């Protein structure tokens, strides 16, 4: 029998007995009732123990915070955006081309037009970390070590970390590294040099420094037509002037440059009264046409 119902029945019985005794004048207090002990139902024999549901494993993430499976696409998009910025900046005398085999490697060349390194043509390679843009700053290595205080005389690597001690995402860009590589040839810095000899000569014997710079420029020019160190279809290479090939390309470039200028001149020409004859600088040289009346 259900204990709840049995307890209710006994209570009714006790209540009726008390009422009868009250009618006869005999008051009797009932003893204190004790609550029945609560028990959990027995566990069935074939029941399985209840366990806490396991939470799904966290999705693998790359170092830049994106899902690991999206990492290559995110990196490719970042590098494409960086190259677009380089093109828009139009850095004077600096040309770069991403590698065919790896987007993390760019080939480039710097043309120095004036200053101590005038007429210098320096080829280089930019190495971008595989966790870009969250890693260290890109490395820039010249194909031939240039005699410069900030260029390692053995490896040819430029001290880029001097300007980018900590690479900051969404703040630093590769075009800034290229601009820095160009600027070091116009503004010489000798503090904490990678080439101590070049730094000392620049500070104490500028003439000898200039002589060594000229020698370095000549070496780079003499080896300009050498095959690229890295075998890649997009590596930058130079060849001697060939009129049958280069003359036509030169004319096309000059023609494309003249057309915008001609269109601009036509657009700014305004028709109106003038007292100067075309081709003359003398005032009132234009003949007036009389109208017959």
Curated annotation (Swiss-Prot):
The keyword GTP-binding belongs to this UniProt entry's keyword annotation: no
Modified residue annotations for Phosphoserine: 30
Domain UBC core: 74-222
UniProt keyword list: Apoptosis, Cell membrane, Cytoplasm, Membrane, Phosphoprotein, Protein transport, Transport
Domain of life: Eukaryota
Membrane topology, as annotated: Peripheral membrane protein
Chain intervals for the UniProt region annotation (Disordered): 1-63, 253-293
Bias kind Basic and acidic residues: ranges: 14-23, 253-265
TM spans (from-to): none
GO biological process, one term: protein transport
Keyword Protein transport applies: yes
InterPro entries registered for this protein in UniProt: Ub_conjugating_enzyme, UBQ-conjugat_E2_core, UBQ-conjugating_enzyme/RWD
PANTHER family, per database record: UBIQUITIN-CONJUGATING ENZYME E2 (PTHR24067)
Protein function: Component of the FTS/Hook/FHIP complex (FHF complex). The FHF complex may function to promote vesicle trafficking and/or fusion via the homotypic vesicular protein sorting complex (the HOPS complex). Regulates apoptosis by enhancing phosphorylation and activation of AKT1. Increases release of TNFSF6 via the AKT1/GSK3B/NFATC1 signaling cascade. FHF complex promotes the distribution of AP-4 complex to the perinuclear area of the cell.
UniProt family annotation: Belongs to the ubiquitin-conjugating enzyme family. FTS subfamily.
Name listed for the protein in its UniProt record: AKT-interacting protein
Gene that specifies this protein: AKTIP
